[in-house]
Amino acid sequence: MKEPVWDEHADWWQREFTDGVDPEYVEQIIPLALEQVEGLDRVLDLGTGEGQLARAIVERQGGFVVGLDPTRSQIQVAQQRGGRVHYGLAGSDALPVADASFDAVVVCLVFEHVDALDASLTEVARVLRPGGRFVFFLNHPLLQTPDSGMIVDHMIEPPETYWRIGPYLPEAATVEEVQKDVRVRFVHRPLSRYVNGLIDAGLQLECMLEPAPPPGFIAKAGEYEHDVVRTTPRLLTLVARKPE
């Protein structure tokens, strides 16, 4: 799971996506995660980064919350930012955790950067107790494929705006310049790859959510103030359970 890019760009991630500055986290991801783990005492935030989701969970409901991430610079900042979270260094495909240790595992925008998907899902299933819940956030694998995005076609009158979908079925890794001089590696997989991976790991899919982009995101990205963007989900959430 460890990629040098996350050490290199840790400051960028912390500046742009944490500490309340990113509306998708504040208005959508964190509230959804809190809803899904409500009442569950032992929670693992896998790929915790600087820990904003883990902190939100422990602040809301207490309990025993662990944040694991393979990037040392992220974990160092997580520890500096405090909270009653237990942090550690680990990749998603080899967790230093005993079997059936957690009531819930949350993975947020992580596995689309991980090559070892099957091993990671197997580890998630291993550390969940029977009946435990897996909450899995990812960039929507159909609507956020490489080269997807809003297109304004000026070749017709009046101009037509639509959402272009890039190559969907091929499983491939790409490096995208997400901001000037910030290049991040993504692994695109079709949705069936994730669902079948859950099944192969022994997990049962219970719920799939495709929320519309939150108002704060639309307002922040002014060029996206169009119905085609408002009605095209950026996020996909899968909720699965380990059988009793």
Segments from the language model and where they lie:
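A short SAM/SAH-binding and catalytic strip from SAM-dependent methyltransferases
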Residues: 104-117
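Short alpha-helix
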Residues: 172, 185-208
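Conserved class I S-adenosyl-L-methionine
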Residues: 1-39, 52-56, 74-77, 81, 133-173
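C-terminal lobe and adjacent flexible extensions of AdoMet/dcAdoMet transferase-like proteins
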Residues: 197-244
